[in-house]
Amino acid sequence: MVYPIYSINDALVGFQSPTIMNNDAFALRAFSENFSDVKNPADYSLWKIGDFDSDTGEIIPCVPSVISRATDFVKGEE
């Protein structure tokens, strides 16, 4: 099975360690839960950086693409 590989980009530090998720929906949920309260949300974005084939062990690169930005999930004042 082929699973997408994601990485969080911190604009001040760079890309973080990659993680494998089932699909974009799972990745977006995890990203939104972890980055909705963060300071400086404009610094963080979720990127798809490739795929992992669990049958062959191959990592398949792709042109990195932004899936979402933390600013999309910032909670308003309550």
Predicted segments, located by residue:
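Short, mixed-charge low-complexity intrinsically disordered segments
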Residues: 34-78
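Short aromatic-glycine-(Arg/Gly/Cys) micro-motifs in beta-strand/loop hairpins
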Residues: 1-15
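A generic alpha-helix propensity feature with a strong bias for hydrophobic helices
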Residues: 7, 21, 64-67
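Charged, amphipathic alpha-helical segments
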Residues: 23-33
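A short, exposed loop/beta-hairpin motif centered on an aromatic-Gly-Thr core
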Residues: 14-23
